[in-house]
Curated annotation (Swiss-Prot):
This is Inter-alpha-trypsin inhibitor heavy chain H1. GO terms for cellular component: extracellular region. May act as a carrier of hyaluronan in serum or as a binding protein between hyaluronan and other matrix protein, including those on cell surfaces in tissues to regulate the localization, synthesis and degradation of hyaluronan which are essential to cells undergoing biological processes. Belongs to the ITIH family. The modification Phosphothreonine is found at residues 405, 410. The modification Phosphoserine is found at residue 131. Residues 31-36, 676-914 form a propeptide.
């Protein structure tokens, strides 16, 4: 993992390109999202809508709770052209260490939502992308960033909204946490806002916000920052006129640079232990410790490939670093090309005379030969081992080995596996090894594995004008060791799934974070012990936290994520599993990959093992865009294949076979819920139809039946006692059965349990579980106490919503709702109360008139060569919000859907759930 990739960093842009030109040339960049209108904003004398496209708003919202950052970026663009479509490009750049968890594009009521699945399935589904044609998102990689770009068309007089969510654990570096947002809109944005909200139980000790592109006067006017106790807040909301300064007549924005928020927390108490919902997070960064003296060896590549700027910048950095080595430290330098040479051959004290002599040696050395990396490292290790063996354990300084190379081993031992073994056997866990890889022409994965195997990390040094500063920045992170052999201990019988809790060294200005899962039995208190070695003494500490007091503390969190401690644990665990798999092979690597994949799917993270596809959004070849994590070794700003433009439903013709819109806003849902109300969205009409089915409890109804594949969904009704005599007994779905015979898959779902293949004694899951069981191309994603999603490979995707009843609710039993997310690959012969509507449906509504209920309209509908009396009404869609739901306006067909459904409703009664 790249040690320099810390904090949060994001770059956004909306590029506006005219569809009328043969060559797509960007006319402007913009940022947009939902924001508040400005009161008394003066009318601008300039055009803020180049090409007729208005970047209406942008909101960057970051909520941090105990280092866990939840980031939502929402942007909106409006095409004001009366008759012409426009192409819009959405660019987002996020840290490589962050995980995307959600992405959606909305246009004219149609929402296209990201669907996270394992990468193998995603690429199997989109084979054309593998053959070199990019499936829509440009996957690029900067220094510590990943960039995604998607081009879509927005119809005349239409708008598009983008929303991206990602999460990360902030890393403390050089005494502070950083949130950096790089903005570059160029075009004026009507409503621009960056809102950062921080909650830290220890209390916030400092908070600062700066923008590189602001004068002091403008910063004072536009940046509002405050902190008190546990809460901190930063708001940046420039008006359009402020965006134009210092050029009031310009149509471009001066917003161009870094917006940076930095903060730290109080360290008055040794313990920062957070417990919530059977998960804990422990943040360890004690203050007032004495700096340890250190033994430091630099191993420097002087092979011929280092010529030019590389060796010049390396020498500059070494000279400055040697100037910062403290009295009491000891050091040496090892150089390797074809031969290996050391400055002294053993450690010498950091006296002024020795430091000056070392600087002279650095100025004079020249490049020579090939790359004997193995020999150079073993010489450096030998020097440190010899020095360490001469000290009693308690008085031993902290030993650090740092290697800088720009190439691959070409002299001496060149087999990478053998080099890893040699280094591992020589160090034997005594001290950390940090590898710095200069440039891109090297095997960075090799350096990374070597560092991880030896308690350190690897960092890439980019060939740029600031390479000297990059090298110095790395050294500053490890310059002041405070503790060695740090171990954080927890009750063995109470803690499960612990993240890394042993660290070779702890450095000033950093922080050790450990998270874990607490066993189900209730604990009134939770304890952590810390053992380490400091400067000439042992370090011991005990932390104790009362869970009830912790609950009171967490209730103070106005915007706290309900499960943020659990997601923090999941984030750290996945990162560690991915790091461990790098140095494993065969079955061990496969097991680690399987664990990381399962957790990535459980928590809906885009990781190196998963991909996010955007359902329903397609280009001219029918490809859907995908979001992937880029590999570390990928070159920055490299585009794969030609640019593709994806078309939103607002500009698509009516489909002839299936609606291309798969995931929709609440008024565009197909499903059945409550007692039971069927809702059918008809994309050709951009309207919905609805009907009820009145049957007795115990009756099983066919919802989906595909005769070509045998796939089926059936639902059994349960009853609810009427609230007063003579009232009809309401019924709900209390049991659902999904069957896919080609894969021998069955799933039985009730409000109590979820059973996979019940006829053969398959596993049983509770709604309290977060799980992703999979069988032969069918993936079930159980989202704890909320819903589950069934995805059939090359088939369909369905959602089952859990409804828990409460006192006073209409239903007296828990029940289920069923929704269709993707039916595009079901056959044209699919039947069932829902399945028959997967094919295109046409209808006409006429004679709209006031109904017997003055709040509703009646009308006449022509559908399937029948004329029906219908009523305009409201139903509720619970697919996005199971507790409250969202209103759906629809034409209601009376008498159990008579005239709309094929046959009569009793034709859909079946004898069994499968």
């Amino acid at each position: 993992m790249d040690g320099a990739a810390v904090g949060l960093r994001v770059l956004l842009g909306l590029g506006l390109v005219s569809l009328l030109t043969l060559e797509a040339m960007p006319a402007a960049w913009g940022l947009a999202t939902t924001g508040r209108p400005r009161a008394r904003e003066k009318r601008q004398a300039v055009d803020t809508t180049p090409d007729g496209v208005l970047v209406k708003s942008l909101k960057v919202n970051c909520k941090v709770t105990s280092r866990f950052a939840h980031y939502i970026i929402t942007s909106q663009v409006v095409n004001r052209q009366p008759n012409e479509a426009r192409e819009v490009a959405f660019d987002v750049e996020i840290p490589k260490t962050a995980f995307i968890s959600d992405f959606a594009i909305t246009a004219d009521g149609n929402t296209f939502i990201g669907d996270i699945k394992d990468k193998a399935s995603a690429w199997k589904q989109y084979r054309k992308a593998i053959s070199g044609e990019n499936a829509g998102l440009v996957r690029t990689s900067g220094r510590n960033m990943e960039q995604f770009t998607i081009h879509i068309t927005v119809g005349a007089q239409s708008k598009a909204t983008f929303q991206l969510t990602y999460e990360e654990v902030l890393k403390r570096r050089l005494t502070q946490y950083d949130i950096v947002i790089k903005v570059k809109p160029k075009q004026l944005v009507q409503h621009f806002e960056i809102d950062v909200d921080i909650f830290e139980p220890q209390g916030i000790s400092k908070l600062d916000a700066q923008a590189s592109f602001l004068s002091k006067e403008l910063a004072a006017q536009t940046i509002k920052e405050s902190f008190s106790g546990k809460k901190g807040h930063v708001l940046f909301r420039p008006t359009v006129s402020q965006q134009q300064q210092p050029c009031p007549t310009c149509s471009t924005s001066w917003l161009n640079g870094d917006f940076k928020v930095t903060y730290d927390v109080n360290r008055d108490k040794l313990c920062d232990l957070l417990v919530a919902n059977n998960y804990f997070a422990h943040f360890f960064a004690p203050k007032n410790l004495t700096n340890m003296s250190k033994n430091l060896v630099f191993v420097i590549d002087i092979s011929g490939s280092m010529e030019g700027q590389k060796v010049k910048q390396t020498k500059e950095a070494l000279l400055k670093i040697l100037g910062d080595v403290k009295p009491g430290d000891s050091f040496d330098l090892v150089l390797f090309g074809s031969r290996v040479q050391s400055w002294k051959g053993s450690l010498v004290p950091a006296t002024q005379a020795n430091l000056q002599a070392a600087q002279d040696f650095v100025r004079r050395f020249s490049l020579a030969g090939a790359t004997n990396l193995n020999g150079g490292l073993l010489r450096g290790i030998e020097i440190l081992n010899k020095a360490q063996g001469s000290h009693p354990e308690l008085s031993s300084p902290a030993s650090i080995l740092i290697m800088l190379t720009d190439g691959e081993p070409t002299e001496g031992e060149t087999d990478r596996s053998q080099i890893l073994k040699n280094v591992r056997n020589a160090i034997r866990g005594r001290f950390p090894l940090y590898n710095l890889g200069f440039g891109h022409d090297l095997d960075f994965n090799f350096l990374e594995v070597m560092s991880m195997e030896n308690s350190g990390w690897a960092q890439r040094i980019y060939e740029d004008h600031d390479a000297t500063q990059q090298l110095q920045g790395f050294y500053n992170q490890v310059a002041n060791p405070l503790l060695t052999d740090v171990e954080l201990q927890y009750p063995q019988d109470s803690v499960l799934s612990l993240t890394q809790h042993r660290h070779k060294q702890y450095y000033d200005g950093s922080e050790i974070v450990v998270a874990g899962r607490i066993a189900d039995h209730k604990l009134s208190t939770f304890k952590a012990d810390v053992r380490a070695r400091g400067e000439r003494q042992e370090f011991k500490a005990t932390c104790l936290v009362d869970e009830e007091e912790m609950k009171k503390l967490l209730r103070e969190r106005g915007h706290m994520l309900e499960n943020h401690v659990e997601r923090l644990w999941a984030y750290l665990t996945i990162q560690e599993l991915l790091a461990k798999r790098m140095k494993m092979e065969g079955e061990e690597r496969a097991n680690l990959s399987s664990q990381a994949l399962k957790m990535s799917l459980d928590y809906q993270f885009v990781t190196p093992l998963t991909s996010m596809t955007i359902r329903g959004l397609t280009d001219e070849d029918g490809l859907e865009p995908t979001i992937d994590k880029t590999p570390e070794d990928s070159q920055p700003l490299v585009k794969v294949g030609p640019r593709r433009t994806f078309v939103l439903s607002a500009t698509q013709p009516s489909p002839t076979a299936r609606s291309s819109v798969v995931s929709k806003l609440p008024n565009q849902v197909t499903g059945v819920d409550t007692d039971p109300h069927f809702i059918i969205y008809v994309p050709q009409k951009e309207d919905s139809l609805c009907f009820n089915i009145n049957e007795e409890p115990g009756v099983i109804l066919s919802l989906v039946q595909d005769p070509d594949t045998g796939f089926s969904v059936n639902g059994q009704l349960i009853g609810s006692k009427p609230s007063r005599p003579g009232q009809h007994e309401a019924t709900y779905f209390g049991r659902l059965g999904i069957s896919n015979p080609p894969s021998d898959f069955q799933l039985e779902v009730t409000p109590r349990n979820i059973t996979l293949n019940p006829s053969s004694g398959g596993p049983v899951f509770s709604w309290r579980d977060q799980a992703t069981p999979q069988k032969d191309g069918v993936l079930v994603t159980i989202n704890k106490k909320r819903n589950l999603v069934v995805s059939v490979e090359d088939g369909a995707t369905f959602e089952i919503v859990l409804h828990r009843t409460w006192k006073g609710s209409a239903a007296h039993q828990d029940f289920l709702g069923f929704y269709v997310l993707d039916s595009s690959r079901m056959s044209a012969r699919t039947r069932g109360l829902l399945g028959q509507f997967f094919c295109p449906l046409d209808f006409e509504v006429s004679d709209i008139r006031p109904g017997s209920d003055p709040m509703k309209l009646d009308a006449t509908m022509r559908v399937k060569n029948r004329q029906l009396a219908v009523t305009r009404g409201l139903q509720r869609d619970y697919s996005k919000d199971p507790r409250h739901g969202t209103e759906v306006s629809c034409w209601f067909i009376h008498n159990n859907g008579a005239g709309l459904i094929d046959g009569v409703h009793t034709d859909y009664i079946v004898p069994d759930i499968f």
